[in-house]
């Protein structure tokens, strides 16, 4: 299970259970790896029901 993804180019870390950014109450529910699927991206599911797709080429993945 993915715990977090780090985007070095943007100096950003997206972590399950934490707000998507410092100014938001919206938390990350789950991160799914679809890099081998047609989407070729990470799918980030948010607590407000929205989804975020991260398709940066340089991503560091941290697992639980």
Curated annotation (Swiss-Prot):
PROSITE patterns with a match to the protein in the record: EF_HAND_1
Name this protein carries in UniProt: SPbeta prophage-derived uncharacterized protein YoqI
Annotated source species: Bacillus subtilis (strain 168)
Gene: yoqI
